[in-house]
Amino acid sequence: MKVNLSPMVSSDFKSVLRKRFKVLAAFVSAVWAIQALNWVMDNSLNPAFGLIPRQFTGLDGILAMPILHGSFAHLISNTPPLLLMGALLAATATRALLAVNTIIVILSGALVWLLGSSAIHIGASGLVFGWFGFLVTRGLVDRSPITLGVTLLTGLL
């Protein structure tokens, strides 16, 4: 039995959702393109733009860290949670989506800059875990078992 949810979802919401999914797909595609460029350049983007804790020259890494990866294996491991959590965030978040992402990137990067080891830090894990925390909190606050359940299931995978 096939259920048609189209009449239950407004065309405005569908349009917004389509736009958000396109942004998510463009972001993940850009991260893959940057990794390809980084690979061609023998990973020289990582030391140039990665986050270096407690060094002012490493502060730009706060913004660059989520789009840099150490290898294709690293990116492959980050892609499913980026897509799953990103899709759930796109489907459930409000107009505050840009603000949520900005706060997560800056806060996670600042914490790594303050508390991280002296190594160069790269990868989207801070963003993924930030999305996870936001979605769990959102599920609890909204008392949404679907949001909470899907988020926790995605987190376990």
Task: Give residue ranges: language-model regions.
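A detector for small-residue-rich transmembrane helices and their helix-helix packing motifs
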Residues: 2-157
